């Protein structure tokens, strides 16, 4: 299974980009959740505006779908400057980054998604750009080649990554503001679903929004995706109104259970408990048993299961907790610690 094909994947789908832009809040006051980050950003942005300076460079990290791109757009909007967007894999050569940087206006925001995937050559260009607002470029080839310095306008780099551990120390140290985005609470997701339903012109009651929010794995992108699928169900099998009962029917049909787990989550838990006695089991062994790539389990499936207390990651491997046994309706073996 391709990770982006999962209904409960936090990764963006290409066809969702237009829809996401339509429901994306423009101001910090409209942004739901991440209260600590919002409070900090509000102060930093106001201070930068008062000093008429570029905002410090910002690093946002955390699981996919939590609003890193949305926050970058909000920061640019609140600063009243332009936003240029790109991603690590697209910036293949140093010249690609140099072209972007030299076209920035003063105090503009440059947003680089998946910044951990920058090549070393591109990263080298970024260091002096971030520190001194300068870049070195080579003119000519061979013995006649020479390096010249180009001054850049002051700008703010916002880097986003789902794998902060892969960032090099020199790059990480150049960010003045760094924040880990957390999974959202149920009440925050309910607010997001209610807001999106209004923008989609979908009839929904609070209990229906709560049911969708409860199964959204703490992730706004998943909440909005589930809302659209439940809307389809409501229009075909119901009267267009999303209630708790209808949301429950729709999501059960879509195989997203009351905890937001799908078939892949259940398969991983079942393999760990039934095939390996609850562990400890190595991630490579689990990946083969589940039939998925190690990276998919490690970066996408595991974090939510760990956060919900169903799996523990130990030096000897993955271990199923008592919650996992209860969820699968399997008796915990005697003498096994939770």
UniProtKB/Swiss-Prot annotation:
GO terms for biological process: DNA recombination; DNA repair. One of its GO terms (cellular component) is Holliday junction resolvase complex. It catalyses: ATP + H2O = ADP + phosphate + H(+). Keywords: ATP-binding, Cytoplasm, DNA damage, DNA recombination, DNA repair, DNA-binding, Hydrolase, Nucleotide-binding. It is an enzyme of class 3 (hydrolase). Its EC number is 3.6.4.-. Gene3D superfamilies: 1.10.8.60, P-loop containing nucleotide triphosphate hydrolases (3.40.50.300), Winged helix-like DNA-binding domain superfamily/Winged helix DNA-binding domain (1.10.10.10). It is found in: Cytoplasm. Residues 4-184 are annotated as: Large ATPase domain (RuvB-L). Residues 185-255 are annotated as: Small ATPAse domain (RuvB-S). GO terms for molecular function: ATP binding; ATP hydrolysis activity; four-way junction DNA binding; four-way junction helicase activity. The keyword Iron does not apply. Residues 258-338 are annotated as: Head domain (RuvB-H). ATP binds at residues 24, 65, 68-70, 131-133, 174, 184, 221. The RuvA-RuvB-RuvC complex processes Holliday junction (HJ) DNA during genetic recombination and DNA repair, while the RuvA-RuvB complex plays an important role in the rescue of blocked DNA replication forks via replication fork reversal (RFR). RuvA specifically binds to HJ cruciform DNA, conferring on it an open structure. The RuvB hexamer acts as an ATP-dependent pump, pulling dsDNA into and through the RuvAB complex. RuvB forms 2 homohexamers on either side of HJ DNA bound by 1 or 2 RuvA tetramers; 4 subunits per hexamer contact DNA at a time. HAMAP family: DNA_HJ_migration_RuvB (MF_00016). Has 3 domains, the large (RuvB-L) and small ATPase (RuvB-S) domains and the C-terminal head (RuvB-H) domain. The head domain binds DNA, while the ATPase domains jointly bind ATP, ADP or are empty depending on the state of the subunit in the translocation cycle. During a single DNA translocation step the structure of each domain remains the same, but their relative positions change. Belongs to the RuvB family. Homohexamer. Forms an RuvA(8)-RuvB(12)-Holliday junction (HJ) complex. HJ DNA is sandwiched between 2 RuvA tetramers; dsDNA enters through RuvA and exits via RuvB. An RuvB hexamer assembles on each DNA strand where it exits the tetramer. Each RuvB hexamer is contacted by two RuvA subunits (via domain III) on 2 adjacent RuvB subunits; this complex drives branch migration. In the full resolvosome a probable DNA-RuvA(4)-RuvB(12)-RuvC(2) complex forms which resolves the HJ. This is Holliday junction branch migration complex subunit RuvB. It comes from Dichelobacter nodosus (strain VCS1703A). The lineage of its organism: Bacteria, Pseudomonadati, Pseudomonadota, Gammaproteobacteria, Cardiobacteriales.
